[in-house]
Regions:
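Specific register positions within alpha-helical solenoid repeats of the TPR/Sel1-like families, i.e.
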Residues: 44, 78-79, 119
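Conserved structural position within tetratricopeptide repeats
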Residues: 58-61, 96
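Residue-level recognition of tetratricopeptide repeat
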Residues: 41, 75-76, 116
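TPR-adjacent "capping" and linker segments in tetratricopeptide-repeat scaffold/adaptor proteins
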Residues: 19-35
Length: 122
């Protein structure tokens, strides 16, 4: 039986970089966010809401203050899944994070969606 020789990971990576330049590109944060946004939109087009949520969570993981991603989560809960308590929670997060910026478009949309839910539930 053939014995495997131990290969150090750093040596292996060095060999790959040397023979295949550009084989590994470390994406920047804004590139990852753009990629996750694209994947989110694709998932929404296919009505795969759980997959869309995964990509929104990845965006929020990279940018915890991303109001658009939090608002999009609220809209999925509200309009697609009809999970109103979860939608209200997301909309409240957007409103709290945008406190002091009364004209912020995300905050205005969150307030309008909250009013719509409250009217529907009353």
């Amino acid at each position: 039986m053939r014995q495997r020789l131990p290969i150090k990971r750093s040596n292996l990576l060095s060999a790959i970089f040397r023979h295949l330049p550009g084989a590994w590109i470390d994406p920047k944060q804004n590139e990852l966010i753009a990629l996750y946004r694209l994947r989110y939109k694709m998932a929404m087009d296919e009505q795969k809401y759980d997959t869309a949520m995964i990509f929104l969570n990845k965006i929020i993981e990279l940018e915890p203050m991303n109001l658009e991603a939090k608002l999009a989560k609220g809209e999925i809960y509200h309009r697609c899944l009809q999970n109103y308590p979860a939608a209200i929670e997301q909309y409240n997060k957007v409103i709290r994070l945008a406190a002091g910026r009364e004209e912020d478009p995300a905050q205005l949309r969150a307030r309008a969606a909250m009013a719509e839910i409250m009217e529907m539930l009353s």
